[in-house]
């Protein structure tokens, strides 16, 4: 694992699938000798896991005994509060930034999440720290939220357009990953 910078700008969803979950599953099998495993995906990692399981199903590979998803979107038809930021105009603006920089800075993502809970994660700190001069109280969620992960340009653009804007992940065979069209409804992993 590493935090991507400009040199990884052309890494896409396919690359993340092949170099992430698929490589990890191969490493588990090679290290332990076990051919089936239990897996977990969190947030965008869960979306990647769902994509991977659909791809594995298409390839008739079955290394996963069970899958657990935590705060994961697979159907993006109602993404919650972040949906106000998802439209073609906004995405084109983000893509212009991605073209220049090569990646989305994790701090930009953290700021977006802060705005989703602006009273708790933004304005209270602005008021108390800046206006009132109070020392901020320790808050573990804020530390976690500032430990952002950069996202490569190609992967992030794909994620925004294909998942959020067009909701193609839940459309059978609407996405092709590593040469295979995928269908989430074909996944039979508990």
Predicted regions and their residues:
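Cap/lid segment of the alpha/beta-hydrolase catalytic domain
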Residues: 1-31, 81
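Conserved aromatic-histidine-acidic binding/catalytic patches
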Residues: 8-9, 13, 36-40, 148, ...
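Fold-independent oxyanion-binding glycine-rich loops
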Residues: 1, 71-72, 180
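C-terminal subdomain of alpha/beta-hydrolase-fold enzymes, centered on the catalytic histidine
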Residues: 138-190
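Short coil/turn segments at beta-strand junctions that form active-site/ligand-binding loops
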Residues: 34-37, 189
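Gly/Ala-rich beta-loop-alpha elbow adjacent to hydrolase catalytic centers
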Residues: 40-45, 49
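Short, glycine-/Ser/Thr-/acidic-enriched flexible segments
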Residues: 2-4, 23, 45, 54, ...
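Alpha/beta-hydrolase-fold enzymes
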Residues: 30, 34, 48-156, 167
